[in-house]
Amino acid sequence: VIASPTVIGGVNGAFEYMRDYPYYCWEQKLSKGTMASHYNNLRPYLAESLIWEASQTLPTQTIELAKEYQAPNGGMAYFVPQDRRVSPYLSAYTALAFNWLRDAGHQVPATVENKLHDYLLAFLRKDLMPDYYSRDMASSVRAVALAALATHDKIDREDIKRYQPHVKRMDLFGKAQFLAATLQVPGTGRISDTVADLILAHADQTSGKVSFNESQDSGYKRILSSSLRTHCAILSSLSAYDDKMGSRSKVGDIPFKLVRSITQRRKNRGHWENTQENLYCMNALIDYARVYEKDKPAMVVQSWLDKEKLG
């Protein structure tokens, strides 16, 4: 019998998976370092037997490693830091991860981050897409860049309005990232409402769970897309939207149902499928807990097997 007053309980397997798997490319190393940072901050929620000895040094080591994967144009590459090998999605994801690491108290070198932001700003304003990016994929990746840059006040209401017509092209992951961007930019409340409604229109609800459905072509694998990653990005954005909008929000109990869907997707493995899913899902559970688990629970949990009291 496992009982926990928080959705963050029972996630030991995700940390074990990220701790033990051998990582080689920048995305994997960055995800592992960020997950180690989460481990340090969430230690009271985790089993005492779960030990990650390198967790105290790994986040800083990972940040310092970033320059080895940064191309001259400021973008990030999986292996070789050359302009022609830069991945727009990986670059936007790196900027997001830097934000998460900074929120956890880590310092990000200004030279690396500023070059990265300059690349992303150019990416937003010019046609710098790889040939294999469809227009829909490009719109979704731009949304990730907007979400990352909004944290630093490097985009404004006019930028949001400029990209709003492209929301219809974005997949649900992109829509969730665009919603996250709008929530950080003053004067975009109506746009936030519109995007939230577009996301909610894809919800398929049952009595206890919810799923968000869409069709994608195989090209989205180039930006590491998966249904579960999308669901986790939606949970983060809808939780933030619900918190900000208060009584105006139409979200209802969807975040609660979405948490159930996400946690059950681990099945018997204790973790999700890959680095992207484990990190986005962990972030989503943290974001959910921050909004909906603010109050300390007052409860007593007891269990019986037939008439025998277990505890």
Positions of the model-derived regions?
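Extended, solvent-exposed functional surface patches
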Residues: 1-136, 142-153, 157-160, 176, ...
